[in-house]
Amino acid sequence: MLEDYYPSTTSYYHGGIDDDLYTAKWGMVMTFLDLNDSSLTPFEGTHFALIGFKSDKGVYINNGRVGAVESPAAIRTQLAKFPWHLGNQVMVYDVGNIDGPNRSLEQLQNSLSKAIKRMCDFNLKPIVLGGGHETAYGHYLGLRQSLSPSDDLAVINMDAHFDLRPYGQTGPNSGTGFRQMFDDAVADKRLFKYFVLGIQEHNNNLFLFDFVAKSKGIQFLTGQDIYQMGHQKVCRAIDRFLEGQERVYLTIDMDCFSVGAAPGVSAIQSLGVDPNLAVLVLQHIAASGKLVGFDVVEVSPPHDIDNHTANLAATFIFYLVQIMAQHR
């Protein structure tokens, strides 16, 4: 039995019901699935599993604005309203949440990793609704556990921050997940392939830039780079990064976008990547056929305005799943 795991029992769609897939919405079509069901066998074809990570403990430790614990419900509510474009050959299962208010951050990350591993065992592509960006380490661990030690797994992070901070004194938090991945790779004598899109210089200290400069395998584009380059050149940079890689894990921190587009985040951003450009880049990553799982993190509903940020996060999910389904 999975620890800290709670299957979904409540629908987030409250509109009319229509059996016609041409007019259906996500909330009508998504089906509940219990990962602890002993009768489950691997699925055939391309299908997705949506799981919430109800934790912002890492944000609290990192002195950010707490509230991301409420994000999975907020994103589900927005996603449920979107039109269903996936036909009847692709399914998105809502498998519930990882939740444990009295559990440590490390325990919850471990529980998420086991749930991700189980999804992969059932041939379901994971979609994780954070939670703080501590979500990423648990998601990454689960994906790695589903692979053999020699298998590659590149990481693309759309984020204003590197999240490569050392964690010896404070312990893991929302700003250390990719340093933990890096350290794991060093311990296993693997190269950590990591590409950050949307870095803001005023959000990262010189120690982090120095660490990146000295670390083989880590690349980044600033938000200003992306603005000047345009999406086609950004996509070519991603292609070069993914050359020779068979798998990529994608994580989207909603603080990559300006406060005008994403006001409800753990750490607001005055500058930021254009969401329209981001959609084109995300679709390109999905079209590579290498994307094995993705998450959206750091939505903070208590700080949101008219659900703008939750809706944007749901929009990214909509387009990523659509392209992944087409390239199955």
From Swiss-Prot:
A GO MF annotation of the entry reads: formimidoylglutamase activity
EC number, as in UniProt: 3.5.3.8
- Catalysis: reaction(s): N-formimidoyl-L-glutamate + H2O = formamide + L-glutamate
Cite the binding residues for Mn(2+) 2.
Answer: D159, H161, D253, D255
Q: In which pathway does it act?
A: Amino-acid degradation; L-histidine degradation into L-glutamate; L-glutamate from N-formimidoyl-L-glutamate (hydrolase route): step 1/1
Write the record's keywords in alphabetical order, separated by commas: Histidine metabolism, Hydrolase, Manganese, Metal-binding
Keyword Amino-acid biosynthesis set for record: no
GO terms under biological process:
L-histidine catabolic process to glutamate and formamide; L-histidine catabolic process to glutamate and formate; putrescine biosynthetic process from arginine, via agmatine
Q: Which InterPro entries match?
A: HutG, Ureohydrolase, Ureohydrolase_dom_sf
Q: Which Pfam families match?
A: Arginase
Residues the entry annotates as binding Mn(2+) 1: H133, D159, D163, D253
Q: What class of enzyme is it?
A: hydrolase
Q: Look up the record and name the cofactor or cofactors this protein needs.
A: Mn(2+)
How many cofactor units bind, and how?
Binds 2 manganese ions per subunit.
**NCBIfam families from the entry?**
PRK13775.1 (NF010347)
Checking PANTHER family in the record gives: ARGINASE/AGMATINASE (PTHR11358), FORMIMIDOYLGLUTAMASE (PTHR11358:SF35)
User: What family does the entry list?
Assistant: Belongs to the arginase family.
This molecule's function is given as: Catalyzes the conversion of N-formimidoyl-L-glutamate to L-glutamate and formamide.
HAMAP family named among the record's database cross-references: Formimidoylglutam
What is the protein's given name? Formimidoylglutamase
Recorded source organism is Streptococcus pyogenes serotype M5 (strain Manfredo)
